[in-house]
Swiss-Prot record:
One of its GO terms (biological process) is bacterial-type flagellum organization. One of its GO terms (molecular function) is mRNA 5'-UTR binding. It comes from Bradyrhizobium diazoefficiens (strain JCM 10833 / BCRC 13528 / IAM 13628 / NBRC 14792 / USDA 110). This is Probable flagellum biosynthesis repressor protein FlbT 1. Keywords: Bacterial flagellum biogenesis, Repressor, RNA-binding. It holds the Pfam family FlbT. Belongs to the FlbT family.
């Protein structure tokens, strides 16, 4: 069964190892094939936008997902998650789900779980900033001083 994808004007999508850019009008595609990685632009992180530990994990999983040889990213991935679990042990259930999906070869589901890790990280940051307002003010001072 073909996957139906609707693209907004100028939206990009990765199909396999190709980037497809839509023109200035909406487009509807039917993609037929098995085990072809497909990522919409909104789901793609770049090294520049992967600016937190959880986003770096997502980037590593994303690179596994689109790579013909996902194992090339395993070292990076496992180093990142080791550091996260050491710093935030409560993240283990999410990391475990990502790990299981990677080991089972379900990299798309691992990518979805990596999104949950990003959301969890954002939740923890929000809680920290709510209870440590000075930390947020210090962060603003550093960014304006640069």
């Amino acid at each position: 069964m073909a996957l139906k994808v609707e693209l907004k004007p100028h939206e990009r999508i990765i199909v396999g190892n190709s980037v497809i850019t839509n023109t200035d009008q909406r487009a509807r595609l039917l993609i037929d094939g098995e085990n072809v990685p497909i990522l919409r632009e909104r789901d793609i992180l770049t090294p520049e936008t992967a600016n937190t530990p959880a986003k770096l994990v997502y980037l590593a999983v994303q690179l596994m997902y689109i790579s013909p040889d996902p194992q090339t990213q395993h070292g990076t991935y496992f180093n990142l998650v080791r550091d996260i679990v050491t710093a935030v042990p409560s993240s283990w259930p999410i990391i475990e789900a990502i790990n299981n999906n990677i080991l089972n070869g379900d990299l798309y589901r691992a990518l979805k779980d990596a999104r949950k890790l990003i959301a969890y990280e954002e939740k923890l940051r929000g809680q920290y900033e709510a209870t440590h307002p000075k930390a947020e003010a210090d962060k603003d001072d550093v960014s304006t001083a640069a």
